[in-house]
């Protein structure tokens, strides 16, 4: 491998000649050969937004020339476009402040600018008015906020729309309800599906409620929150540039001491992701139970047959999309535990669990985004109810007896249900045998369409 020599304050080190990072990135590569989980691309993209905004703000206050700021901005745009993804090889398991990733970005920007004739120092120019201690927390928040608004919410809205279409397609179909895994009173199939839709829409409102705190940035706090070496008003200048570039409402955190040491906004936002995961698991479980069969299960729903389900049982088709949803949900719940514990470790002036927090948040956002689209396309949009099976189960249910309570009383109604169950007869036959109602009276009283 061809190398070139780079130096930092610790001396010289050989760096691959065909890459654009510098000495500090190389030291991190050699010192932290752990796991293999690289910094999420969303974090690198967020850094590229942040570094461009910082460069333009530094030019505004005279700390960089227009040429220097322009060179930084040009490279940042290419990084966001994915042109230099291979230049960001560092793993999550590094320093807890994310310093090495910050320097990785600084070094790559400086080297690429130099290739174009603009000499920049990674620290003095690209990192001017900044510290890893305020840039990584800011990039973390930028990435989280944009992942919510650009990925999770649009995907969730598409899934909710698919449920609304299913809901509107069967306005009059009545089915038996179930509570405690036992038969309950009837409801419309559309009403059940409306519940599934709201299970997607409610966490979306929670995510939107989390955005204002998540959009508060630590930038301008520098090392410990005092703003040392940052010009006055620098935080607002950076955030103004970010607002212009991204369209998101990023603002300076008014208390930088809080911003550097706390990750409560991330915990709150991820809590909404966990709520979405929990609701998706409930929906997936409902659907796969109701689609169980084809002959010996509930069989009230038909779901798409996407692939063979068994290597030994010919013709078997499984609810694979539902299973993928439930596994993704479990992972998100595990990620939530990691983020919560990491947030509790903000000792003194800095939280040093930032990379693992960023990794888990982005993993959750990506999993939920991908699994919701997959679930929608390969399952939800192909769901059809088995109206015949639903109606048969409805008519066979003893819980229709509930509508008799106002007419014959709770205890008499219970006696009718127990007799029908014990004798293996219909509810109508039991009521007539006990003499509580005549046939016409029963038929007039027990009408499922009036119970929903």
Describe each region flagged by the PLM.
Residues 1-452:
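Conserved, well-structured ligand/cofactor-binding cores
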């Amino acid at each position: 491998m061809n190398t070139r020599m780079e130096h930092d304050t610790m001396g010289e080190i050989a760096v691959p000649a065909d890459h654009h990072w510098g000495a500090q990135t190389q030291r991190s590569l050699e010192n932290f050969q752990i796991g293999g989980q690289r910094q999420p691309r969303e974090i690198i993209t967020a850094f590229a937004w942040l570094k461009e905004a910082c460069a333009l703000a530094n030019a505004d206050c005279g700390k960089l020339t227009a040429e220097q700021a322009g060179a930084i901005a040009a490279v940042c745009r290419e990084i966001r476009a994915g042109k230099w993804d291979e230049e960001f090889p560092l793993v999550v398991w590094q320093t807890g402040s994310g310093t090495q990733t910050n320097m990785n970005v600084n070094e790559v920007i400086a080297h690429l600018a130099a290739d174009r004739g603009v000499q920049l120092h990674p620290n003095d120019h690209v990192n001017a008015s900044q510290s890893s201690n305020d840039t990584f927390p800011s990039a973390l928040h930028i990435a989280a906020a944009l992942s919510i608004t650009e990925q999770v919410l649009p995907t969730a809205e598409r899934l909710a729309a698919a449920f609304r279409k299913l809901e509107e397609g069967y306005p009059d179909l009545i089915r038996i309800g179930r509570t405690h895994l036992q038969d309950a009173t009837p409801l419309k199939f559309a009403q059940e599906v409306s519940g599934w839709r709201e299970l997607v829409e409610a966490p979306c409102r929670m995510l939107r409620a989390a955005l204002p705190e998540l959009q508060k940035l630590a930038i301008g706090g520098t090392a410990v929150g005092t703003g040392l070496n940052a010009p006055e008003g620098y935080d607002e200048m950076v955030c103004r540039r970010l607002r212009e570039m991204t369209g998101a409402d990023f603002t300076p955190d008014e208390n930088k001491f809080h911003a550097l040491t706390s990750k409560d906004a991330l915990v709150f936002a991820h809590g909404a992701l966990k709520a979405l995961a929990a609701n998706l698991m409930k929906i997936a479980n409902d659907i796969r139970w109701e689609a169980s069969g084809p002959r010996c299960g509930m069989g009230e729903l038909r779901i798409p047959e996407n692939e063979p389900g068994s290597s030994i049982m010919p013709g078997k088709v499984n609810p694979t999309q539902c299973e993928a949803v439930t596994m993704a949900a479990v992972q998100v719940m595990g990620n939530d535990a990691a983020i919560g514990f990491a947030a509790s470790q903000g000792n003194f002036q800095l939280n040093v669990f930032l990379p693992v927090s960023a990794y888990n948040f982005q993993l959750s956002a990506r999993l939920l985004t991908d699994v919701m689209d997959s679930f929608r396309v390969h399952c939800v949009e192909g769901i059809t109810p088995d109206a015949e099976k639903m109606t048969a189960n409805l008519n066979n249910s003893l819980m229709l007896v509930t509508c008799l309570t106002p007419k014959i009383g709770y205890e008499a109604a219970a006696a009718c249900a127990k007799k029908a169950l014990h004798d293996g007869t219909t509810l109508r036959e039991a009521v007539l045998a006990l003499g509580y109602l005549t046939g016409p009276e029963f038929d007039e009283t027990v009408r499922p369409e009036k119970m929903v």
